[in-house]
UniProtKB/Swiss-Prot annotation:
Protein known as: Tumor necrosis factor receptor superfamily member 1B
Membrane topology: Single-pass type I membrane protein
Signal peptide: 1-22
Subcellular location: Membrane
Keywords: Disulfide bond, Glycoprotein, Membrane, Phosphoprotein, Receptor, Repeat, Signal, Transmembrane, Transmembrane helix
Cytoplasmic side: 289-474
Length: 474
């Protein structure tokens, strides 16, 4: 068999030689000069410009230790540790392997003479900056999709994730860079519908299910209807229907009395306000009743000299006889005699003023005494009184005790009348009179006294004008 094969090979070579194309049996490493316009025959050769010859390249894991020349071919050598050559080359040195992988990277290929070290990002990171060699220079954390969002598509090699909102009927309740939106739970009885971030809740599910049957009472109000008047109300008009429940729990609504609390508070405050208002009105009415119905004020009578006071007494008697002929002469005489007795030794007219002031104490009770005296027999005289004010409680009692009745029966005993009593003028003056009022009285000594309504026609220079101030007979 072997000689036959050799003969076949020889025949083929002869035919090729005859045609002018010769093919060497093996590749010759010796350099050769390429034909003009032609390149080196194979890719494992390179053209050396210095030698102008085609020379062989070094295989992966080796480098060109010596370059070729016209007589010798390229001499190759293996790469040292930590260095490599990955392709056919004619480098004068090997390439260094990449540095060790960082903490966020993982080494996928070790450094060898024929291959560089390869680092890839961790599962929770992606390559943000990739080199031409395929290694990743910088890794970053993957984006995380929050609740309501899910990963739109799976992450590509060294790529970041893309988040998208969950479509209707799906949800995502986690924060993750890998979870996608999941469909809602399908319930026969839906208790709580789901949304983009929560799943649906079925009515048959409960956090603490109870398998023990129990009985509850459901209150149902009766329909409105007319009832007889003699029906006595029972303790409760609402029937209770017992309902037996199985293992399925239900939510029992609790009725609280939260509405009754504000109503009771409002009613209580309203009642308290009305009570306070009533007490205030009662206090005002009591204060109004305590006020006196008649305010007394001491009349300031101008001081007259002695001669004028004597003339005034005489003119008063004459005027009373002239204007009131029907009056009793005995009452006028008693009035005149009382005025003479009460006059001081020096003839000072202050005694007359005191007598007139004493008679004026009955201003408040004058109307009652006059009305009561109409039923009695005798002659009555209506007297216009000048009020004397006593502010103090002690002096008011004193002043009232000194008052004399000017309306009465003229036939009464004159000895029992208070006119016979000698009362000093100092006791008739009220201590409540202010200093200003005293000064005002002294200043009005020579001024005319203001006249009343019946005295408008009488002038101060007419006789008897002063007497009408004390007593006026209609």
């Amino acid at each position: 068999m072997a000689p036959a094969a050799l003969w076949v090979a020889l025949v083929v070579e002869l035919q090729l030689w005859a045609t002018g194309h010769t093919v060497p049996a093996k590749v010759v490493l010796t350099p050769y000069k390429p034909e003009p316009g032609n390149q080196c025959q194979i890719s494992q050769e390179y053209y050396d410009k210095k030698a102008q010859m085609c020379c062989a390249k070094c295989p992966p894991g080796q480098y060109a230790k010596h370059f070729c020349n016209k007589t010798s071919d390229t001499v190759c050598a293996d790469c040292a540790a930590g260095m490599f050559t990955q392709v056919w080359n004619h480098l004068h040195t090997c390439l260094s392997c990449s540095s060790s992988c960082s903490d966020d990277q993982v080494e996928t290929h070790n450094c060898t003479k024929k291959q560089n070290r390869v680092c890839a990002c961790n599962a929770d990171s992606y390559c943000a900056l990739k080199l031409h060699s395929g290694n990743c220079r910088q890794c970053m954390k993957l984006s995380k999709c929050g609740p309501g969002f899910g990963v739109a598509r799976s992450r590509t090699s060294n790529g970041n994730v893309i988040c998208s909102a969950c479509a209707p009927g799906t949800f995502s309740d986690t924060t993750s860079s890998t979870d996608v939106c999941r469909p809602h739970r399908i319930c026969s009885i839906l208790a709580i519908p789901g949304n983009a971030s929560t799943d649906a809740v079925c009515a048959s599910e409960s956090p603490t299910p109870s398998a023990v049957p129990r009985t509850i009472y459901v209150s149902q109000p009766e329909p409105t209807r007319s009832q007889p008047m003699d029906q006595e109300p029972g303790p409760s008009q609402t029937p209770h229907i017992p309902v037996s429940l199985g293992s399925t729990p239900i939510i029992e609504p609790s009725i609280t009395g939260g509405i009754s609390l504000p109503i009771g508070l409002i009613v209580g405050l309203t009642t308290l306000g009305l009570l306070m208002l009533g007490l205030a009105n009662c206090f005002i009415l009591v204060q109004r009743k305590k006020k006196p119905s008649c305010l007394q004020r001491e009349t300031m009578v101008p001081h007259l000299p002695d001669d004028k006071s004597q003339d005034a007494i005489g003119l008063e008697q004459q005027h009373l006889l002239t204007t009131a002929p029907s009056s009793s002469s005995s009452s006028l005489e008693s009035s005149a005699s009382a005025g003479d007795r009460r006059a001081p030794p020096g003839g000072h007219p202050q005694a007359r003023v005191t007598a007139e002031a004493q008679g004026s104490q009955e201003a408040c009770a004058g109307s009652r005494s006059s009305d009561s005296s109409h039923g009695s027999h005798g002659t009555h005289v209506n007297v216009t009184c000048i009020v004397n004010v006593c502010s103090s409680s002690d002096h008011s009692s004193q002043c009232s005790s000194q008052a004399s009745t000017t309306v009465g029966d003229p036939d009464a005993n004159p000895s029992g009348s208070p006119k016979d009593e000698q009362v000093p003028f100092s006791q008739e003056e009220c201590p409540s009179q202010s200093q200003w009022e005293t000064t005002e009285t002294l200043q009005n000594h020579d001024k005319p006294f203001p006249l009343g309504v019946p005295d408008v026609g009488m002038k101060p220079n007419q006789p008897g004008w002063y007497d009408q101030i004390a007593v006026k007979v209609p």
